[in-house]
């Protein structure tokens, strides 16, 4: 189970019985619960596509990446490595996206999922309340991650559009 932030992960973990603290996650009752700390990964800076773009020059515009790159922020690498290890652990059969319900939550989770090279089935916890009863009900009604592909694509398009407008 991967939440967007530690406080949410703690609430979810308490309800599902994952109360043993580990380095970067909680474990128990057959669950491992961790968090992303917001956007762990994002679109690469322009100089990742061409070192000449490290210094902004009008003559280089427009900068239009042919193949977009996602990168992990240097200050977030430790948590990313924890998530990658957890998602790809041999005993993990599926991964639950418990990031915030909405397009940004989809982008935050899937950026990490993709960069980690995870191929495990993905489920989605979609809740709008952090009440214990809402969390329990959400876990009883997990949906396929594929049901939210459109939201992910919308968030990714928004991120790319922001990048293009911001850089150009």
Question: Which residues does each predicted region cover?
Answer:
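Intrinsically disordered, low-complexity regulatory segments
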Residues: 1-168
């Amino acid at each position: 189970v991967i939440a967007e932030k530690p406080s949410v992960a703690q609430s979810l973990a308490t309800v599902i019985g994952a109360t043993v603290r580990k380095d970067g996650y909680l474990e128990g009752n057959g669950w491992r619960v961790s968090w992303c700390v917001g956007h762990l990964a994002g679109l690469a800076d322009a100089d990742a596509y061409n070192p000449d773009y490290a210094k902004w020059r009008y003559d280089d515009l427009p900068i239009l990446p042919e193949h977009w790159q996602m990168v992990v922020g240097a200050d977030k690498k430790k948590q990313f490595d924890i998530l990658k290890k957890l998602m790809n652990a041999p005993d993990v059969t599926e991964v639950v996206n418990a990031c915030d319900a909405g397009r940004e939550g989809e982008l935050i989770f899937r950026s990490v999922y993709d960069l980690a090279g995870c191929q495990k089935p993905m489920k989605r916890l979609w809740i709008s309340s952090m009440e214990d009863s809402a969390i329990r009900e959400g876990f009883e009604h997990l949906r396929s991650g594929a049901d939210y592909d459109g939201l992910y694509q919308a968030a990714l398009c928004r991120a790319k559009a922001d990048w293009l407008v911001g850089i150009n």
